[in-house]
Amino acid sequence: MSLLTEVETYVLSIVPSGPLKAEIAQRLEDVFAGKNTDLEALMEWLKTRPILSPLTKGILGFVFTLTVPSERGLQRRRFVQNALNGNGDPNNMDRAVKLYKKLKREITFHGAKEVALSYSTGALASCMGLIYNRMGTVTTEVAFGLVCATCEQIADSQHRSHRQMATITNPLIRHENRMVLASTTAKAMEQMAGSSEQAAEAMEVASQARQMVQAMRTIGTHPNSSTGLRDNLLENLQAYQNRMGVQMQRFK
């Protein structure tokens, strides 16, 4: 895997799924391919994106700044600086300085990532802030190692919370989670169906599922009533794809 592919993989792992994720992936591809060279416009676009946490925006802003060539005097952006200040905790800043000194001795992406992984997310963010604010310099490879270590830690904690969701026994939360998943699956089906005639059937199934979820939420239903809702949808989608000759096993 090339360095930029690895960076893209780690960064996208912390962006919530949805249309915005696809948009960010495209922006990253363009930046890494040297197609997008207007850093100021890129940062303005990033600043106004909804849904993303300040830290995710800060990391993306850091990656864009590392990659897009810009004039030396280009102003640093406040929203990135605020996100990468380690919550203003002096302990994070102390650890960030120690980490920075170690990173100065590293020359490879993987070496930097290994060193960084033993620090907390707050210290890693602060260290990125040091580099972003030009208070320290490291090679681009080392900076990318720091980025990927931070993303790995964030993705780990997100994964833990997803696992917790899977093991929650509260029937009301599980019921709502099934309905949310059915709704997002239906939306994805509608987007994938396109405008072909064969797609009408898939659109119909998706539309019915969304109406059903809406009705269940409006009138209030027994927590078990949503069992199998998403699985039925996925079976329908799979059957539709097989007829269309499309294989998207990974969708599940």
From Swiss-Prot:
Function of the protein: Plays critical roles in virus replication, from virus entry and uncoating to assembly and budding of the virus particle. M1 binding to ribonucleocapsids (RNPs) in nucleus seems to inhibit viral transcription. Interaction of viral NEP with M1-RNP is thought to promote nuclear export of the complex, which is targeted to the virion assembly site at the apical plasma membrane in polarized epithelial cells. Interactions with NA and HA may bring M1, a non-raft-associated protein, into lipid rafts. Forms a continuous shell on the inner side of the lipid bilayer in virion, where it binds the RNP. Determines the virion's shape: spherical or filamentous. Clinical isolates of influenza are characterized by the presence of significant proportion of filamentous virions, whereas after multiple passage on eggs or cell culture, virions have only spherical morphology. Filamentous virions are thought to be important to infect neighboring cells, and spherical virions more suited to spread through aerosol between hosts organisms.
Cellular localisation: Virion membrane; Host nucleus
Topology of the protein relative to the lipid bilayer: Peripheral membrane protein
Annotated region (RNP-binding), positions in chain: 165-252
Main localization of the protein described in the UniProt heading: virion
Gene name per UniProt: M
Chain ranges for the short sequence motif Nuclear localization signal as given in the UniProt record: 101-105
UniProt family annotation: Belongs to the influenza viruses Matrix protein M1 family.
Subunit structure: Homodimer and homomultimer. Interacts with NEP. Binds ribonucleocapsid by both interacting with genomic RNA and NP protein. May interact with HA and NA. Cannot bind NP without genomic RNA.
Keywords: Host nucleus, Membrane, RNA-binding, Viral matrix protein, Virion
Organism placement in taxonomy: Viruses, Riboviria, Orthornavirae, Negarnaviricota, Polyploviricotina
Protein name: Matrix protein 1
Miscellaneous comment: Most abundant protein in virion. When expressed alone can form virus-like particles in transfected cells.
Annotated stretches, region: Membrane-binding: 1-164
